[in-house]
Amino acid sequence: NINFLKGIDSVRNLAYSTTRSVRGMERTSFSTFERVNYLFPVDEEEVSKIEYNFKLENKTHSVNLFKENYFELLSDSEVRKMMGYSNKVRECDEMIDTEFMNLKIDLDGQELLNEKYSEYDRFATNGKQETKLINTTLVSSFKHVYDDFYLSKVLNNVELYQEMLGVLIEFDEDIIGLNVDSKGNSAWRKRYMILSKNHKEAIPLELYGDGMKKAILLMSAVIASKNGILLIDEFETSIHTSAMNKIFSWILSTAVKLNIQLFITSHSKEAIDKVLKCDPTLQDKMNLYTLYKKDDSTLTRKLSCYEAIEAMDDYDIEVR
């Protein structure tokens, strides 16, 4: 939606949604300044740029994000005011070298947004309006390796918790339940335990294989993304082919149930085939997009689920 780009919330959503899955940045205490800085490549240039194109109603649009960092001397009182602590001006103020950032968003050469942020804008918002964050979750292909899950949402939903256990039987047929180790939690992360018929005591989830951890990560991420957007990179990694149908079917059906827009990527022909065919009742809700290079451009080919299956099965066309 082009109008969405014009809103100040678009910047906060972009910064928050893109960095919330980064280790240590899931806390909302990080400022927009810190998150926007993280979006751009680290280089020696003072001005950084992100550019992308998209097609809407047969018209190609170009979006450019420009970031420029610079420093200004501010008094200690001004800094404290920016942080929301005090409006009082002190008689002897220390001067502080403060980093600022100008962020501009252009659409087709026309300026949509021009905002200024400071490293001390911890709590400030434009015009005291409340930021409307879109519930967006990004799952990288290796996130399960760090035992980083979204299980707090799962444990608060009895119905989906039971459904998830039914799927996890594919990895451990003796699994009984999953809970939080109240003694083993740290300030940054909860420790989760698996109850199994094979063991007298609960086993830490981190001791299980990558397949179990990846399945739990994907399913918990779906539940955490209710009424939002879920992006999964290389969704099939660490999932054995024998378990793909059940897991993918649950993910897709639950995404529909919870009103989630789901984007998944893969380079695996077998995984793409599995996800397209795992639940025929959902095939009218799926599209396959293939990115490919032509000359100096990256182009997109869109196929419906039915077209993609026909292309693979009847004509042996490469859809990856």
Language-model features, listed with the residues they occupy:
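Walker A/P-loop
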Residues: 2
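Phosphate-coordinating catalytic segments in nucleotide- and nucleic-acid-processing enzymes
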Residues: 5-218, 223, 292-320
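Phosphate-binding P-loop
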Residues: 221-224, 254-256
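Walker B motif beta-strand of ABC-family P-loop ATPases
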Residues: 229-231
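Walker B catalytic acidic pair
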Residues: 233-235
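C-terminal lobe/lid and adjacent interdomain/linker elements of RecA-like ASCE P-loop ATPase modules
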Residues: 246-320
